[in-house]
Amino acid sequence: MEKQVRVRYAPSPTGHLHIGNARTALFNYLFARHQDGKFIIRIEDTDVKRNVAGGEESQLKYLKWLGMDWDEGVDVGGEFGPYRQTERLDIYKKLYEDLLERGLAYKCYMTEEELEAEREGQIARGETPRYAGNHRDLTEAQVKEFEAEGRIPSIRFRVPADRDYTFKDIVKDEVAFHSNDFGDFVIVKKDGIPTYNFAVAVDDHLMEITHVLRGDDHISNTPKQMMIYEAFGWDIPQFGHMTLIVNESRKKLSKRDESIIQFIEQYKELGYLPEAIFNFIALLGWSPVGEEEIFSQEEFIKMFDAARLSKSPALFDSQKLKWMNNQYMKKQDLDTVVELSLPHLVKAGRIGETLSEQEQAWIRDVIALYHEQMSFGAEIVELSEMFFKDHVDYEEEGQEVLKGEQVPEVLRAFAGQVEALEAMEPAAIKAAIKAVQKETGHKGKNLFMPIRVATTGQTHGPELPNAIALLGKEKVLXRLQKVIG
């Protein structure tokens, strides 16, 4: 009988959920759900100094916002807990003590200064820096001497000599490492806390993880973890290392890269939709059959085949994300779009936090003008700018339009029509423009463009009668008068 698929996403609470981690979580989630397996969240919080307040809560909050759920974890429990590494220290202790007893690990009393001097010497000689094994076989007398000096040891794993470590990677196919390329590595730090490679190997085994899907930057950790599995006689899970995400300059995506918004909470704050972010991230290093790019979560689960994980770096295309979010925005009802937009208009000082019924209806109509055009909620501030300014600046193209010989005649006639209107309704504005056509004989672009540029400042924009109606009589007449002179 085949084992049930069990995968995990194991963040460190050293920061908030960013694109790279979100992709790792998402691919594990899709892999598990596609195969009716289990998706586990484990918190790797042993690097206590780097943990940030609220980091764990933020990770879980934004995974949920993206639409993911999990079967086991810190907040939902499960039979393989605890799911927080700092609550598993006794488990690790028993196991590393077993390695010490069997001579597969040993105490190393070298100081940071001694290790740094060794490293610098290796670099100066053109060698690859690695631990040279100075404390591999200490005598009892040497150990007593170091302890008398008050030295606190770390524990190192004794790397087997002359061994090949080969594994079939789900993404990269066969990957090989040689043990002689590794020095004996630390499995327990001087403070008694296990290192990443030891704790991860132990947890993955005890939690019965069948597949380890993670970023390419972890591939050099794999042979070390394989050595630990081997030392305990444990079955080794299947590994899959997803390719890097690169920016538009084809450089590895870095948290310090300011050209790209990195954190999921920032996208939420900007008024992006979780379904669109889910869709976009799911295509960063994985592709379905065919050309279609918009899929629901259920569709992704149904078709997610790990064999289609890409071997090439995944390009993070910000413009494509905007396009994709726009596709999802178009499908939303107006209430949702208004809800995504209002906080940004308040933040920009365009509207107050409390609105009268009349103001609510007006701003709703303004947002409706841009529903089809908006890429994300915060974009409404820039798109709707003309409604909140007394005067408009004309685009270069618009300035050329206003130089036309017919412009004064058209605008005077239109101003007269607007002046006579009892109510600024789109139908009435449409009728007023038709009346100007009849009165002046101008039509098409010669008629519409001067009116659009004079009233909105733009050569392109939303439906003109609707926009003019929402601008209001006073603002429209003031703008027309400015051009007429």
UniProtKB/Swiss-Prot annotation:
Record motif 'HIGH' region, residues: 11-21
Enzymatic reactions: tRNA(Glu) + L-glutamate + ATP = L-glutamyl-tRNA(Glu) + AMP + diphosphate
Task: Kindly state which keywords UniProt assigns to this record, in alphabetical order.
Answer: Aminoacyl-tRNA synthetase, ATP-binding, Cytoplasm, Ligase, Nucleotide-binding, Protein biosynthesis
Q: What is its EC number?
A: 6.1.1.17
One biological process term from GO is: glutamyl-tRNA aminoacylation
Q: Where is the signal peptide?
A: none
Q: Which GO terms describe its molecular function?
A: ATP binding; glutamate-tRNA ligase activity; tRNA binding; zinc ion binding
In terms of Pfam families, this protein maps to: Anticodon_2 (PF19269), tRNA-synt_1c (PF00749)
Task: Tell me the residue numbers annotated for binding ATP.
Answer: K255
Q: What main location does UniProt list?
A: cytoplasm
Q: Where in the cell is it found?
A: Cytoplasm
Read off the HAMAP family from this record: Glu_tRNA_synth_type1
Question: Entry's PANTHER family?
Answer: GLUTAMATE--TRNA LIGASE (PTHR43311), GLUTAMATE--TRNA LIGASE, MITOCHONDRIAL-RELATED (PTHR43311:SF2)
Could you give the subunit structure recorded for this chain? Answer: Monomer.
Q: Which family does it belong to?
A: Belongs to the class-I aminoacyl-tRNA synthetase family. Glutamate--tRNA ligase type 1 subfamily.
Q: What does this protein do?
A: Catalyzes the attachment of glutamate to tRNA(Glu) in a two-step reaction: glutamate is first activated by ATP to form Glu-AMP and then transferred to the acceptor end of tRNA(Glu).
Q: What is this protein called?
A: Glutamate--tRNA ligase
Query: Which species is this record about?
Result: Bacillus cereus (strain ATCC 10987 / NRS 248)
Q: What is the name of the gene encoding this protein?
A: gltX
